[in-house]
């Protein structure tokens, strides 16, 4: 069972955050392509949660959370345990749809988009409890 929580944030601020997030995700996708990954999904949404990017290289699947923040520490702190659980639930749904599921190795990564810097890719940012 998935819980959906809604915040009361002013519309202009939500729009600004949305477009900043979309730009950050596009930059992160470019970065992963540069590193030899194929982008399987962008903004994969389920009732349980959303995955910013799903990338593949061979049997390795990256479930990527993208955060645009001023510092790396802020980006890392922006991913709460609740976010991780939602990402895991959405990943389970995506993985269940893959024909080669049994062959896949899954990793949960973070890509931090920082001002005037290259994207910072943190492999295995968190691990699944499942």
Curated annotation (Swiss-Prot):
Matches recorded under SUPFAM superfamilies: Restriction endonuclease-like
InterPro entries with a match to the protein in the record: Restrct_endonuc-II-like, tRNA_endonuc-like_dom_sf, UPF0102_YraN-like
Gene3D superfamilies in the cross-refs: 3.40.1350.10
Similarity comment: Belongs to the UPF0102 family.
Any Pfam family matching the protein: UPF0102
GO molecular function (one): nucleic acid binding
Protein name: UPF0102 protein BT_1882
Source superkingdom: Bacteria
């Amino acid at each position: 069972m998935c819980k959906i929580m809604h915040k009361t944030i002013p519309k202009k601020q939500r729009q600004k955050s949305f477009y900043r997030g979309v730009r950050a995700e596009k930059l992160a996708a470019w970065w992963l392509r540069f590193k030899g990954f194929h982008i399987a999904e962008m903004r994969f949404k389920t009732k349980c949660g959303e995955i910013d990017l799903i990338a593949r290289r061979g049997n390795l699947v990256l479930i990527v959370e993208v955060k645009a923040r001023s510092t790396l520490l802020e980006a890392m702190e922006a991913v709460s345990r609740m976010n991780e659980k939602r990402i895991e639930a959405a990943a389970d749904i995506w993985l269940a749809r893959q024909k080669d599921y049994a062959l896949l190795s899954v990793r949960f990564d973070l890509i931090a988009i920082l001002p005037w810097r290259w994207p910072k890719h943190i492999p295995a940012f968190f691990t699944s409890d499942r």
